[in-house]
């Protein structure tokens, strides 16, 4: 479906059930995930994905023998694009804990909605967060010289989170998830991490190759959950990271997933970060910007053998009502190294503009460049996100996390 050039609102319909923090079933660390013995192995193909025909044809949502597993020898047939960080070939088993019906429904929801390739997918069912060893760099120690821009602003109960993803052109995905017992969220995914490329969009239509899409849960680059907690990452220069053998490791992108799935606010997110040593195996070093619906924000930086938490509470009298991050470390607030014009522009605008008057997408357009693949504006208090692909700021796509009717069925309409 070609929707490029039309001014559209994409309202993703969502459901909510009983919610709670993830329990012991979600395990992240150097030892991997638990309960693998309960899963039934299935055959694998040369794309490194599960052979659906080998799985019992049942729609049961509770039978463990209907869930999916990948064999450890699985590997993709196609070469990964430059600067991608493929995970499919590294999986000892799929992160999916779906029934066959959920697996089929998830792939059936995959839909291309923009010619600057953007897909939507609604993941049904459960998944595990996999350990950091799953990532492998296709271009070891090599990072493109691109930049990203993130900001958060809050005033009088209204918060906004903006993000430019500046990188090589790859197919992108808006992913909706709601794993049992955890929080619903919307997130943005660069599908190059799954081995997809601009030169092979037909792979999304291949029943064999598209199955890698179920691993998209593992690699969000920015997103927001139902409580309004929002998070994004930006590349920074590599520095020494913590290496405590007594502390479990978690990959940076898995931390994004953990936060979206299990934290309601910045304080809870900080407590999750404190439980892990964040690693960047097979991917560039990044720092994190987080903001919630209550005026709290935080920049998290890993480097110099430690983790820094730069906290801001916009509800405190005299405190600034914004934070931002680009592509240099902020932990030395008096003299941050490597400041860029984008950060200066964000600082100037956010310091001088009342949130009521702020035009967040316009600000992102001013700090974007030719490599800006998507611009996303999240509204934590409303559960909404606007996405612009390829700097097409005249035609934003609007997604709504709060619509509850007709779960799993996107509906298109005029912009609100």
Task: Give a label for each model feature.
Residues 10-11, 30, 145, 210:
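Mature extracytoplasmic/luminal segments of secretory-pathway proteins
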Residues 232, 238-365, 369-372:
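A surface/extracellular/periplasmic glyco- and lipid-processing/surface-interacting theme
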Residues 14-29:
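Bacterial N-terminal signal peptides
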Residues 33-73:
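Ser/Thr-rich, Pro/Gly/Ala-heavy low-complexity intrinsically disordered linkers and tails
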Residues 1-14:
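N-terminal secretory signal peptides that target proteins for export/translocation
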Residues 35, 67-263, 278, 352-416:
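N-terminal mature-domain region immediately after signal-peptide cleavage
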Residues 2-4, 43-44, 51, 57, ...:
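Intrinsically disordered, low-complexity peptide-like regions
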């Amino acid at each position: 479906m070609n929707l490029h050039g039309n001014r559209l609102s994409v309202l993703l319909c969502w459901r909510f059930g009983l919610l709670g923090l993830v329990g012991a079933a979600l395990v992240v660390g150097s030892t991997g995930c638990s309960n693998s013995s309960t899963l039934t192995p299935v055959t694998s193909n040369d794309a490194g994905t599960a052979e659906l025909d080998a799985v019992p044809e049942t729609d049961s949502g509770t039978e463990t023998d209907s869930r999916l597993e990948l064999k450890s020898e699985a590997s993709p047939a196609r070469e990964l694009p430059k600067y991608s960080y493929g995970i499919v070939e590294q999986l000892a088993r799929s992160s999916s804990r779906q029934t066959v019906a959920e697996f089929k429904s998830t792939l059936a929801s995959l839909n291309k909605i923009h010619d600057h390739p953007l897909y939507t997918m609604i993941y049904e069912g459960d998944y595990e967060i996999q350990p950091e060893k799953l990532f492998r760099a296709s271009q070891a120690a090599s990072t493109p010289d691109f930049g990203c821009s993130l900001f958060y602003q809050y005033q009088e109960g209204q918060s906004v989170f903006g993000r430019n993803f500046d990188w090589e052109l790859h197919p992108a995905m808006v992913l909706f998830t709601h794993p049992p017992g955890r929080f619903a969220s919307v997130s943005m995914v660069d599908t190059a991490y799954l081995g997809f490329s601009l030169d092979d969009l037909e792979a999304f239509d291949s029943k064999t190759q598209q199955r890698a899409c179920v691993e998209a849960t593992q690699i969000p680059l920015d997103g927001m959950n139902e409580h309004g907690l929002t998070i994004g990452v930006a590349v920074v220069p590599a520095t020494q990271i913590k290496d405590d053998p007594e502390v479990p490791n978690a990959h940076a992108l898995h931390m994004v997933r953990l936060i979206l799935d299990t934290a309601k606010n910045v304080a809870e997110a900080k407590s999750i970060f404190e439980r892990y040593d964040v690693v960047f195996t097979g991917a560039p070093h990044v720092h994190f910007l987080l903001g919630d619906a209550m005026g709290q924000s935080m920049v998290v930086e890993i480097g110099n053998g430690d983790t820094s938490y730069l906290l801001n509470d916009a509800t405190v009298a005299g405190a600034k009502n914004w934070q931002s991050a680009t592509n240099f470390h902020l932990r030395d607030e008096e003299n941050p190294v490597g400041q860029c014009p984008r950060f200066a522009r964000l600082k100037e605008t956010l310091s001088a503009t009342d949130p009521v008057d702020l035009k967040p997408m316009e600000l992102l357009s001013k700090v974007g460049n030719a490599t800006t693949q998507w611009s996303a504006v999240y509204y934590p208090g409303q559960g909404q996100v606007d996405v612009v692909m390829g700097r097409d700021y005249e035609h934003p796509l609007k997604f709504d996390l709060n619509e509850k009717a007709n779960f799993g069925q996107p509906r298109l309409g005029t912009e609100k």
